[in-house]
């Protein structure tokens, strides 16, 4: 019994440490990009503001994305954005809610996706979320938007782009390295 209990503590401690490392990893990148003139970010979202996002969209946000929101709300590098909660100089808006709801209505975006980034006529980046489970992280997808023969915009089936938000964020950071 002691061996099993010891193993359980070891495994639990390992997962706690792994999550702390992932969070520090994300924070270190944000600090790195704060030094760039091209990187713009907002004030971090409060837990109440994050709850508004979840309630408004009827989803539970993955923990990694919650940590991102609490660190910098939303951000951009040049003309590439990661949507979230915009909070700066007393102005508060929720582009993640607005854009996700708009595309749910206009394109029948499934309820288990939120819109991380959308550039009209270029690309749509989606983050898989759950309505019932608090996930640690989830997959990031892209989808194409095109006009059908009736003149209506339609969305293609989402295809896997990254296995995690962390991978997506790393790709975002490469913009700074390439700049």
What kind of region is each of these model predictions?
Residues 157-171:
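Alpha-helix N-cap recognition
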Residues 121-123, 132, 147-148:
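Short Gly/Pro-enriched loop/turn and capping motifs at secondary-structure junctions
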Residues 1-25:
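N-terminal amphipathic/basic-hydrophobic helices that include classical n-h-c signal peptides
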Residues 146-151, 156:
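Compact, glycine/acidic-enriched structural inserts
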Residues 22-125, 175-179:
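A surface-exposed partner-binding patch
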Residues 131-137:
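A short alpha->loop->secondary-structure connector
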